[in-house]
Amino acid sequence: MEGEHVLICVAWPYANGPLHLGHVAGCYLPPDIQYRFERAMGNKVLMVSGSDEHGTPITVTAETQGITPQQVVDQYHAINKEALIALGCGWANTLDGRGPEYGGALFNRTSDGEHKRMVQENFSALEVGGFFERKTTEQYYEVNSDGTGRFLPDRYVEGTCPVCAAEGARGDQCDACGATYEAVELKDPVSKMNPSARIEIRETDHLFYRLDLFQKVLEQHANSQQGIWKSNVKSMTKNWLDMGLQPRAVTRDLEWGIPVPLDGDDWSGKCVYVWFE
């Protein structure tokens, strides 16, 4: 009997620091066990993961260390891949020893040219299909004493969570309570990299993914999985759907990342939001 085709999708951690035991226990050891089991069963299995090399986690680390974002991701991609292989995870052999038709274990990078092509291709298709809407939003903007400045997306701004009042919340989410919100809802905002800088609110245009268009179909899918999903997954999904899905921004005022594949000066200096990527 010919083996089944199995795809194992593993989380992609940011390449902004060394992995720790939590990464191994939480997202690398379980899929590696599954990978070995599927191979032992004679299945054709492909396990895919790699380094998430874009977004503010990378640029903030680069600015803190005084090096370029490329140097950050090159350094930690190599360190983390070598560490996983040293632990005995199956990333050493990209192709299965039985032959390429049996799959293998691919530990890739989001800086890979093929990844960029696919992201921009799918982004453009969604835009043409009418799944994006353009909005003028208000964002925090850092103004320096010499008159220069920049927008403060995601980890570039910290403050007090508007939901649970925890300090140290970021511009896109609060790690304490898990809430997501618009950046300007953050209270007592401070620039992460330049705390003494004056912060003001400025307008900037972004594209938003129309998640609300999928409300009904996702409710139907969630209902069909009640006997399959774990209780925490079911409750979390129900909470999101009960609140009503809202459009989410898929672009950022940031140059490190995959450029927005649209014509016009309005999109110059903007990239695809790393979570959407």
Q: What annotation goes with each model-predicted range?
A:
Residues 70-76, 122-139, 154-170, 195, ...:
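Short, Lys/Arg-enriched charge-dense amphipathic segments
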Residues 1-135, 147-150, 162, 226:
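N-terminal Rossmann-like or analogous alpha/beta NTP/dinucleotide-binding catalytic cores
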Residues 37, 107, 123, 131-132, ...:
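Phenylalanine-focused residue identity feature
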Residues 1-49, 117-118, 164, 173, ...:
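Structured secondary-structure scaffolds
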Residues 130-206:
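Cys/His-rich short segments
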Residues 74, 109, 113-120, 136, ...:
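Short, amphipathic alpha-helical segments
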